[in-house]
Amino acid sequence: MSQADLPEPAPAFQLKGSMLAITVLELAHNDIERLDEQLAAKVEQAPDFFNNTPLVLALDKLPEASREIDIQALVALCRKHRLRTLALRASDAAHLEAAAALDLPVLPPSGARERKVDPSSKTPAKPAEPTYRPTRVVSTPIRGGQQVYAQGGDLVVLAPVSPGAELLADGNIHVYGPLRGRALAGIKGDTTARIFCRQLAAEMVSIAGQYKVAEDLRRDPLWAEAVQVSLSGDVLNITRL
């Protein structure tokens, strides 16, 4: 048998595109001691959220005078609070050098991927037609550690959502039972998305990146009630169903 007659081996891997919800820790000040204290407080509020959570460290918003920061100590501090640093978001040369030394990937600064539009263009590009996907319906309980994502549409869960579970949707999220895990609606920036549930007992709710954690939610008079969550500006509103 010649080499050409040999069957091709089955592929050992596939490269697939994926949209993952990654937490971004955006530093506003170069104060590791204060960061340690405030992260500890956040962990106490939502311990299940800080459980080997993947993280992007964003250093691009630091003031110019505060950019000399010990990145190795910063990554160690995040690990101490069970946050796993996947990458840095930075442009400062010293930050890029430190990232290379730690073998951390670097993402471009916020807004760096935006393209300038030439106003003199005579023929504007035709916008892409939106892709509509059917609502994703889940009828079984969502256990702790599970993640369910409805890409391009709404997510409907007809069963309880346990602590440690995570619901993600580009559109709305409906839970016809107790919501005890995390629910993130409008994760691609849809500010009109909403979250509906029969019983609000969530670790976190988020719409288009604006969120409230369990400690904030427990202080709401509608805690443990049937509610809807909507976004007005940068404020999450919780109202009775």
Swiss-Prot record:
| Pfam families linked to this entry | MinC_C (PF03775), MinC_N (PF05209)
UniProt signal peptide:
none
Using the UniProt annotation, give all residue ranges assigned to the region (Disordered).
Answer: 109-135
Its keywords, alphabetically, are: Cell cycle, Cell division, Septation
Domain of life per record: Bacteria
Note the InterPro entries from the entry. CAP/MinC_C (IPR016098), MinC (IPR013033), MinC_C_sf (IPR036145), MinC_N (IPR007874), Septum_form_inhib_MinC_C (IPR005526)
State the Gene3D superfamilies in the record: 2.160.20.70, 3.30.70.260
GO BP term, pick one: regulation of cell division
User: What's its job?
Assistant: Cell division inhibitor that blocks the formation of polar Z ring septums. Rapidly oscillates between the poles of the cell to destabilize FtsZ filaments that have formed before they mature into polar Z rings. Prevents FtsZ polymerization.
Q: Which family does it belong to?
A: Belongs to the MinC family.
The annotated subunit structure for this chain is: Interacts with MinD and FtsZ.
Query: Per its record, how is this protein called by name?
Result: Probable septum site-determining protein MinC
> Which species does the entry assign this protein to?
Stutzerimonas stutzeri (strain A1501)
Taxonomic lineage per UniProt? Bacteria, Pseudomonadati, Pseudomonadota, Gammaproteobacteria, Pseudomonadales
